[in-house]
Amino acid sequence: MTTLLNPYFGEFGGMYVPQILMPALRQLEEAFVSAQKDPEFQAQFNDLLKNYAGRPTALTKCQNITAGTNTTLYLKREDLLHGGAHKTNQVLGQALLAKRMGKTEIIAETGAGQHGVASALASALLGLKCRIYMGAKDVERQSPNVFRMRLMGAEVIPVHSGSATLKDACNEALRDWSGSYETAHYMLGTAAGPHPYPTIVREFQRMIGEETKAQILEREGRLPDAVIACVGGGSNAIGMFADFINETDVGLIGVEPGGHGIETGEHGAPLKHGRVGIYFGMKAPMMQTEDGQIEESYSISAGLDFPSVGPQHAYLNSTGRADYVSITDDEALEAFKTLCLHEGIIPALESSHALAHALKMMRENPEKEQLLVVNLSGRGDKDIFTVHDILKARGEI
């Protein structure tokens, strides 16, 4: 199919979907390209971001955790956004696109529940019906977010097949959309999947990096040495990275979930420890068995528990423009506790992975003068029960 925008990032990306979905993807691409040129659409989107979601979000300088080092550490506070995470940014854009295309329903998948909450709130705001697929395991470990979705009128559908996590929810959402695309828009929650989703999600998240650049220049008079973000599918990270890609003096660091340790096989780090294949409508690195079956990913954080990654991250990794590392559950949990105890901020477990790597950079070279920005992609309210149970089992509380 001829596309208006390039569907690939190097060799990664594409549109590997059943033929029945091609017209829906073409319609979506046309609507997006048209909307990007429409001042009225942009004004409506920007108004929602400012007056509904609460942008711009703060850039907070850490006061205490850098003590004894020469690191200056800032947090981009996406946790302060309405809905509790960066997810709200792009769902408002996609919901406006859905209305523009004349759709009346939203289909979404969710892992941690943050994209589900964001989809539910955008649907409620704009008068769209909403059904959300969620792995049965995630329904259990993210019960507060499940209730939030239902409070806002969304139908939450637990998925029991496979590993009963995010990848299975994605499969069910795509299956639903195959039969309902004439009236429904599939509101994909990350910068992955078939074209044009990776591009759409990046563009509807890029204000994270744009704001960060303006704020850090105002505060410090220079660009950061590195920006750091967690990577599951990769939407918060690509939103942070997008405006810095051409700033070659700024390091881009993506942090994948190392789970129980890469050597155990129980992780979610396909960029560094997967193989390229076709999954979820795209060509990208993914966790696979020797015979090519999709392997189960694992992370303490439901939002990073995904066996593949967005194609632009795969490209940035292949060219060396961005560096990708992994952080274990234990390291993320320590970072979570550190931010709570010393800065009075409760981060999402997803964001705690990015914070953990920043703390590691700081502690490994305390004499080095460095200016770092961590994208604090979400707040940790949803994770307090998970953390409570772990700390209780360890006898720490």
Swiss-Prot record:
Its cofactor is pyridoxal 5'-phosphate. Its EC number is 4.2.1.20. This is Tryptophan synthase beta chain. It catalyses: (1S,2R)-1-C-(indol-3-yl)glycerol 3-phosphate + L-serine = D-glyceraldehyde 3-phosphate + L-tryptophan + H2O. The modification N6-(pyridoxal phosphate)lysine is found at residue 87. Pathway: Amino-acid biosynthesis; L-tryptophan biosynthesis; L-tryptophan from chorismate: step 5/5. The keyword Lyase applies. It comes from Escherichia coli O6:H1 (strain CFT073 / ATCC 700928 / UPEC). It comes from the Bacteria. The beta subunit is responsible for the synthesis of L-tryptophan from indole and L-serine. One of its GO terms (cellular component) is cytoplasm.
